[in-house]
UniProtKB/Swiss-Prot annotation:
BP-aspect Gene Ontology terms: tRNA methylation; tRNA wobble uridine modification
GO cellular component: cytoplasm; cytosol
Species lineage: Bacteria, Bacillati, Bacillota, Clostridia, Eubacteriales
Protein known as: tRNA modification GTPase MnmE
Organism: Clostridium botulinum (strain Hall / ATCC 3502 / NCTC 13319 / Type A)
Domain spans labelled TrmE-type G: 223-383
Protein's gene: mnmE
Length: 461
């Protein structure tokens, strides 16, 4: 079977660096590496102890020429990440030696690993469950310390323990129902129905606790998609540069300088924010600028938050009003910029009165005035209070969806019991709820979906 092949892949980024690591896992991994390894004083790997390293050289089999100087580490299964015999070859960090060593491993009997196949083997061999496997990629992609800590908690199995606890309780309820149906002479159905409703309400409460922070968790995992919009030359690029502390965007007095979107991540108290600077939205005959304006509108549609910038030194016009109308159904913050010019927008203006004053901030991006207030406003809009790194937060949209479906099935079971329909029909809904939660840990998930999840991993992981 393919799952039992010995696999190999480069585990470090391709390119020049201090070292490269080639990982190999499977029953034949030690034999394969031994066949191309030559230690000091012709020492082999035959007597290498588990969880130790050995210095030597990788040799090309046919020519007997040395490819590179290496350190080989050996982890014996099942006490390894994949729960299989695993070796890692540490060679000099360069494209040529790394590729040549990998080529020799494949010529000697290994197969090139698919993306995420090492982590998939850890899952298939029962070393980790699916939620822990997904946490591996979240750790790699984490943008802030807080998002990394959240992923680490999931990798430790904190979410798995909570899910398994709820599923075990569901199984006990199902067993209780089946016992009641199998022994109707005891006439326990009515008593059992009332007890089950109480149990299900407690389960729903636990699921609700997990769902409640999942929107915040999704932001921790993927970043808050924030788009800066406004007419040309209101200070959008200056705001981006101020937030990232770098001159990423070109700033000039010429309207229409930004013709494409610029994206950068910033960290606000552990919250990853993807800031998108867009082309100024206005009517234009310039073909390139017109494309930029259309891209800006697309980014607004995708945004979690819109920062709408107005220029305090100029009067509001039809273009400002059109932009406001375009974003009115989004979460937004209005920045009244260029406060340093000592001119004041007429705040009695009907347009301003329509805006929620809680979301209006006067700023001078040039002088960094109002930026802290902006950051606090972003936090308050999306996060209820301070996020604690020791709390369990559901960060994965797939997990959130499974929790919601499980909750719906529990509610359906309660309705079935309340309608005094035969109690065994409620067990169908409870079993569905149990199955949906199992999708989080991978116990009840379709194999094709599991394959798709691991295909999104990088090679060597």
């Amino acid at each position: 079977m393919k799952e039992f092949d010995t696999i190999a892949a480069v585990a470090t980024p391709v390119g020049e660096g201090g070292i490269s690591i080639i990982r190999i896992s499977g029953d034949k991994s030690l034999d394969i590496v031994s066949s191309i390894f030559k230690g000091k004083n012709d020492r082999t790997l035959d007597d290498i102890k588990p969880y130790s390293m050995r210095y030597g050289f990788i040799i090309e089999k046919e020519s007997k020429e040395m490819i590179d100087e290496v350190l080989v580490s050996y982890m014996k299964g099942p006490r390894s990440f994949t729960a299989e015999d695993t070796l890692e070859i540490n060679c000099h960090g360069g494209v040529i030696p790394t590729k040549k060593i990998l080529k020799e491993l494949i010529k000697s009997g290994a197969r090139l690993a698919e993306p995420g196949e090492f982590t998939k083997r850890a899952f298939l061999n029962g070393r980790i469950d699916l939620s822990q496997a997904e946490a591996v990629i979240d750790i790699i992609r984490s943008k802030t310390d807080l998002s990394m800590k959240s992923a680490l908690k999931q990798a430790e199995g904190t979410l798995s323990k909570e899910i398994n606890s709820i599923r075990n309780r569901m199984i006990k309820i199902i067993a209780h129902i089946e016992a009641t149906v199998d022994y109707p002479e005891d006439d326990l159905e009515e008593i059992t129905g009332q007890k089950i409703k109480v149990d299900l309400k407690e389960i729903i409460n636990k699921i609700d606790n997990l769902i409640s922070a999942s929107e915040e968790g999704k932001i921790l995992r993927e970043g808050l998609n924030t788009v800066i919009v406004g007419k040309p030359n209101v200070g959008k690029s200056s705001l981006l540069n101020a937030l990232i502390n770098e001159n990423k965007a070109i700033v000039t007095e010429i309207p229409g300088t930004t013709r494409d979107v610029i994206e950068e991540y910033i960290n606000i108290d552990g919250i990853p924010i993807k800031i998108v600077d867009t082309a100024g939205i206005r009517e234009t005959e310039d073909v390139v600028e017109k494309i930029g304006v259309e891209k800006s509108k697309e980014k607004i549609d995708e945004a979690d938050l819109v920062i709408f910038m107005l220029d305090l030194s100029r009067k509001i016009d039809e273009e400002d009003i059109e932009i406001m109308d375009f974003i009115k159904n989004k979460k937004y913050i209005v920045l009244l910029n260029k406060l340093d010019l000592n001119k004041d927008l007429n705040e009695e203006n009907h347009f301003i009165k329509e805006l929620d004053s809680k979301y209006i901030i006067k700023t001078s991006v040039k002088n960094n005035s109002g930026l802290n207030e902006l950051k606090e406003c972003i936090k308050n809009l999306f996060f209820s209070g301070e996020i604690k790194s020791d709390e369990l937060i559901v960060t994965n949209a797939r997990h959130q969806e499974a929790l919601i479906r499980s909750r719906e099935s529990c509610i359906q079971a309660i309705e079935t019991l309340s309608d005094e329909i035969s109690i065994d029909l409620a067990s169908i809904d409870i079993r569905n709820a149990w199955k949906y939660l199992g999708e989080i840990t991978g116990d009840t998930l379709d194999e094709n979906i599991i394959d798709k999840i691991f295909s999104e991993f990088c090679l060597g992981k």
